[in-house]
Amino acid sequence: MNENLKNKNILFCDLDGTLIETISGDTFPKGIWDMKLRFDVLDAIKKLNPEYELIVSNQGGIENGFVDAQKFSKKLFYIIEAIGDYCDCECYAMYCDTNNESDPYRKPNTKILETLLEDYVEDFVNTDFEN
């Protein structure tokens, strides 16, 4: 891991139930439309003033056929843009679409966190914007 990351304010957040919740009140959304941003959480995030917000999520419903992967990707893109804009930070996300608990990308395993740091934050930190 890059030494420059030690000086960065990076926040990892879970998606469902933390950053968003269903409008219907059900545990699982009825469709991609059944969600609302949790502004109480977003306001708390703004106070932390992170440079990066990295969203992680288990989405086993994709593997089970309950959730369409393309529709979920569009929903996630909207969430990333909305949160990044509202919290004024770089926002990225990654999800695991399997229910296999031994998958290194499935939370609580750490590969998804490591990959987000390597692919987004570390690349950004190492970019030479002057040349």
Task: Say what each PLM segment does.
Residues 75-93, 111-118:
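Two-metal-ion acidic nuclease core segments, chiefly of the RNase H-like superfamily
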